[in-house]
Amino acid sequence: MCNHHPKHSHGNDTIRIRGARTHNLKNVDLDIPRHKLVVVTGLSGSGKSSLAFDTLYAEGQRRYVESLSAYARQFLQMMDKPDVDLIEGLSPAISIEQKSTSHNPRSTVGTVTEIHDYLRLLYARVGTPYCPEHKLPLSSQTVSQMVDAVLKLPEDTRVMILAPAVRERKGEFVDFFADLQAQGFARVRVDGEVYQLDEVPKLEKNIKHNIDVVIDRVKVKADIKQRLAESFETALRHGNERALAMEMDSGEEHWFSARFACPVCSYSLPELEPRLFSFNNPMGSCPTCDGLGNTNFFDPEKVVAHPELSLASGAIDGWDKRNQFYFQMIQSLARHYGFDVQAAWETLPAKIKKVVLHGSGKEVIDFTYLSERGTTFNRSHAFEGIIPNLERRYRETDSETVREKLREYQNHRACPSCGGARLRKEARYVYVSGEPLHEVSAWPLTKTHRFFETLDLDGNKKQIAEKILKEITERLGFLINVGLDYLNLSRSAETLSGGEAQRIRLASQIGSGLTGVMYVLDEPSIGLHQRDNDRLLATLKRLRDLGNSVIVVEHDEDAIREADFVVDMGPGAGEHGGNVLIADTPENVAKCENSVTGQYLSGKKSIAVPSERTPVNPGRMLVLKGARGNNLKNVTLELPLGLITCITGVSGSGKSTLINDTLAKITARELNRAQEEPAPYDDIRGLEHLDKVINVDQSPIGRTPRSNPATYTGLFTPIRELFASVPLSRERGYNVGRFSFNVKGGRCEACQGDGVIKVEMHFLPDVYVPCEVCHGKRYNRETLEIQYKGKNISQVLDMTVEEACEFFDAVPTVSRKLQTLMDVGLGYIRLGQSATTLSGGEAQRVKLALELSKRDTGRTLYILDEPTTGLHFADIALLLEVIGRLKGKGNSIVIIEHNLDVIKTADWIVDLGPEGGDGGGRIIASGSPEEVAKVKGSYTGKYLKNIL
């Protein structure tokens, strides 16, 4: 072991941990300096998260929550008390984790960061409302302001002052004209024509008319002030508080209103309030879509799932031969319109398709129905149409299951009323400096930031807005500093990746400006290009300089080198980890012999650049043409098959759109027969070289504690078969199901095979206690009496992969799968470990192992999205070996990645960019790493050049 306890003076400047035993920690004693940037690093599974999150954060949070009243505690999640003897020097803790924010469709980047709240305030206080119809500002003027406006016109301009008396009303208005004459007026303007009052033509009764009373005609001179003022006063009296000055030569009109309203149509608003601009408030949300910005509709393309089939054989699910009632309707339609139910849907005329999908309108059709007794009866009525039928069933059903089923046929589209702006009409026509709120929210953050930095308001508006603007620009600045300049405020929070969501939370934390807090972060560099790394580190240092302790679990080399203090966990993973190898400055860690991290930092170990690249075979290319989803600019992607291709580019350059939303979905639809809707593209060629696509992402392998690596990889089935074939099992007649903890029979019924029982404590966190009957073993006594090589099924589930590998080495079906788990570096996880306790990186590697263990044809396309998340240098070397094995069998691998160690070992690179958001979406460079390194304008190339 290297020097691992720099002795600090035990004052207020250290966090002292003594005897930490959470998860796999081996009684760890550790002193961490406070108010410093501390990086915790080590192999995947070495106990970093156990130390940072499950010990430090859990205890900091728990102590803070304990200080609150019992009433307040019930609303907060209480953390379990970590297994530790003593922790001193803790501050209240805030954790910023990888979990993608919310699945609430109402959450946007603006609402999560609270910038939207400040914008609402700004628009309510200094916004200028406009009339949606006439695009004129709503404003009220005094008579003297109206007079001044007319006097500003060039001298000698002939002006007519009018009172708009009737607007868009039907009638003959005979009495009205007589009344005006009696009051001494001489002229009126009717529908744009000026007449003497006694010469007005007879008006048509059923047409809407506009009538203005002519009050005065003047030439603009300085001495007509008094006369103008009197004319305007008269005009306002007769024109419903409105007046109109028309230049007689050019016909140009100047409208005035004495009320806060549109001078033309009197459209007016109550006083502007912040809630008018909230799409989560009925006052502000668009009434059509309730502020969601999109509406669901039944999509004909999804309803007709198999257009190549006939109606009889299942072009439309549920309306074919197997469903007698609905199919009788289709047959009756076919008789009425004379089409063939056996003909493929694609070949039917458009008119017939329209009737089948949308109904026959008013046309009555004779339907013949067959009752259950076998008698037929006839009815005549219009045909409802399949889509209206689905809409009606969706509206009327009370069953969530039916709704779920019907949702499969739905798609979203932008709301027809607000066009996706989410706000009601009144709010969409309030402008600040000529821009409405929903437009500003849709800009990339850099543009929004510039707009508010340079916003120039006049007079008292400037004073009102000053503080609000400071908050808005500061918060936008923080978002830009963590590399999110390409996002916009209206972007839905559920579409953000884990790394983006985490950095947004990081930015809002800096925005809140707390001091004296302990922040615990989980790999904030995920999804960040090398270029943005410096800005992220500057942000973390800024958090530290505010007076906070910043503890980061991180594998990124720059972060480790820039830290004030590094804690290296190890030496191995799982059972073999849980010790602190060294806790010291980065310089000293690099000198430490035992530390794998140190060896990579000092350059003793490194991931080698392959001596030669596999050449591209021009005959085996996958070509995707015209991809234009999100920000892609009509891109053509050429992927050499049978190689490892890295898709690179700064955050927001379009990598996920191109690969996950376009390529993965097209290939899944064409090769795996999946119901996927890819982003728009023109054409794809070269699919004949592939027979399936596998997308290995970081989503959890199961959301319930019952899901575990053994069940997920299919290991558990052969293990249960082994136990069922033991002589004692045969004797008792036990089958495979006896050894499952998910079905009745072999499992312990007291805890239903969970091994723990949840006890609800109202003011405290729910407590999970081991089941008293089976003592956490999940099975009943009879099942546990069956042993294979001296171990029962519960003991097998408790083995680590490594132990199980030795135990089952004589059983090829099991050992093959176990070996692949070993190969991806997961020897330390337990077979029965609950899926919910696996990190994203671990879940992804379990999936990789599952794919590796399958017999494959060598014609598979593997898609991996940032597989290095959660991986240490040494783990990355392992991962690259595994990917190399997949390639060795002839498969094609596409990796979205920022990690330079992976990028430099790829055969082919496709670099998107140059920037994120609108500034991205183009392919800047493609070729071998050496070729890309030479491309000017490619950020990836610039960093590759330094290491190749």
UniProtKB/Swiss-Prot annotation:
Residues making up the signal peptide according to the UniProt record: none
Transmembrane segments: none
PROSITE patterns: ABC_TRANSPORTER_1 (PS00211), ABC_TRANSPORTER_2 (PS50893)
One of the record's GO cellular component terms: excinuclease repair complex
GO function term, MF aspect, one: DNA binding
Residues that coordinate or bind ATP: 42-49, 649-656
Pfam families per UniProt: UvrA_DNA-bind, UvrA_inter
Function statement: The UvrABC repair system catalyzes the recognition and processing of DNA lesions. UvrA is an ATPase and a DNA-binding protein. A damage recognition complex composed of 2 UvrA and 2 UvrB subunits scans DNA for abnormalities. When the presence of a lesion has been verified by UvrB, the UvrA molecules dissociate.
Cross-referenced PANTHER family: UVRABC SYSTEM PROTEIN A (PTHR43152:SF3)
Protein's UniProt name: UvrABC system protein A
Originating organism: Neisseria meningitidis serogroup A / serotype 4A (strain DSM 15465 / Z2491)
